[in-house]
Amino acid sequence: MKISKRGLLEIAEHEGIVPGPYLDSRGVWTWGIGHTAAAGAQDPEAMARGMPDDIDTAIIGALKQFDRDLDNYERRVNRAIKVPISQHQFDSLVSFDFNTGGIFKARLTQRINAADPNAADSFMGWLKPPEIRRRRVDEMRLFQTGDYSADGDAIKVWRVDDNGHLRGLDRVMHGDDLLAMMKARR
């Protein structure tokens, strides 16, 4: 399976876009749409600090990395889940793994593969850091009901300083614009 456009927008809206490297809430260097060194090539810690001179080009680069990252997480979810699932369930699991990297060790996965009708409750076993709660609730609801909380009209692009701290909103991007920028790649 591949993530749907709505699933892609769900992740982008939860993550936001940061065109320069920043320290996330756990102190991990991150860039673009939630990309960390743990996700693969392009280590944010090794990137030039602060806002790039050409923000639009940096956003396009971040979207290319996001596309590569999605390919990786799609493969991971496809390998981990052994039972048939719907598109919205797949989208919720890609979001979960994109954020946690935990699809192979999660009780959630074990319960889905065991056809446990209450498997989605296990999304709530992954609440660190505490501010992630809303995302887990959204992922759980998406898995259970197909209700996408993100409608793609508010993908925030954040400014970052030379020390890797977020410094306010640069702009809000509409999902249609994000999809158009990614169209050649998806």
Language-model features, listed with the residues they occupy:
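Long, amphipathic alpha-helical surface segments
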Residues: 1-9, 14-20, 26, 37-38, ...
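Generic hydrophobic/packing signal
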Residues: 8, 31-32, 58
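Short, conserved, surface-exposed binding loops centered on an aromatic residue
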Residues: 21-23, 84-85
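Substrate-binding/active-site groove segments that recognize
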Residues: 23-49
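Low-complexity, intrinsically disordered short peptide segments enriched in small/polar/basic residues
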Residues: 30, 52, 56, 152-154
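Structural recognition of the beta-strand scaffold that forms the well-ordered cores
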Residues: 30-32, 92-97, 121-122
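Short, intrinsically disordered/low-complexity patches at protein termini
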Residues: 43-44, 54, 142-145
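Alpha-helical segment that forms one wall of the substrate-binding/catalytic cleft
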Residues: 45-81, 87-109, 117
